[in-house]
Amino acid sequence: MDLKPFARTNPFSGLDCLWCREPLTEVDAFRCMVKDFHVVIREGCRYGACTICLENCLATERRLWQGVPVTGEEAELLHGKTLDRLCIRCCYCGGKLTKNEKHRHVLFNEPFCKTRANIIRGRCYDCCRHGSRSKYP
């Protein structure tokens, strides 16, 4: 597969990681784009996030901010939006949860987690299948 056309359309290609300052690999740049991250600007430089640093950052968030379990209904009331309109990210990989992933939480009575500054986190399909990553601690 030729990655030249991809490099022109991906805003993360050629950027460094915000935390480790290493250049993003093509896979990391692609993941940033697919997970709908925003390019971060610090001191005039543009940054993305490599997978290792992102997962370390999310693990630190889980350790430092004890999450409070909330239902989908409570999350809606807290933010004044329907679950479908809320931006909820995975607490393990940082990807945006799809409507189906949010509805899976409700269907299986798996709570979302309210963390720092009322940020709502959940688990995406990739991070909850096969029991590979537990529910939010």
Swiss-Prot record:
Membrane-crossing segments per the record = none
Biological process terms from the Gene Ontology for this record are: DNA-templated transcription; regulation of DNA-templated transcription; symbiont-mediated perturbation of host apoptosis; symbiont-mediated perturbation of host ubiquitin-like protein modification; symbiont-mediated suppression of host innate immune response; symbiont-mediated suppression of host type I interferon-mediated signaling pathway
Location(s), subcellular: Host cytoplasm; Host nucleus
Q: Zinc finger (unnamed) locations?
A: 17-53, 90-127
Q: Name one GO cellular component term.
A: host cell cytoplasm
Annotated GO molecular function terms are: DNA binding; zinc ion binding
The record's keywords, sorted A to Z, are: Activator, DNA-binding, Early protein, Host cytoplasm, Host nucleus, Host-virus interaction, Inhibition of host innate immune response by virus, Metal-binding, Modulation of host cell apoptosis by virus, Transcription, Transcription regulation, Viral immunoevasion, Zinc, Zinc-finger
Q: Does the keyword DNA-binding apply?
A: yes
Q: How does it assemble?
A: Forms homodimers. Interacts with ubiquitin-protein ligase UBE3A/E6-AP; this interaction stimulates UBE3A ubiquitin activity. Interacts with host BAK1. Interacts with human FBLN1.
Q: Could you tell me what this protein does? A: Plays a major role in the induction and maintenance of cellular transformation. E6 associates with host UBE3A/E6-AP ubiquitin-protein ligase and modulates its activity. Protects host keratinocytes from apoptosis by mediating the degradation of host BAK1. May also inhibit host immune response.
Q: Which family does it belong to?
A: Belongs to the papillomaviridae E6 protein family.
Name of the molecule in the record: Protein E6
Q: Which species does this protein come from? A: Bovine papillomavirus type 1
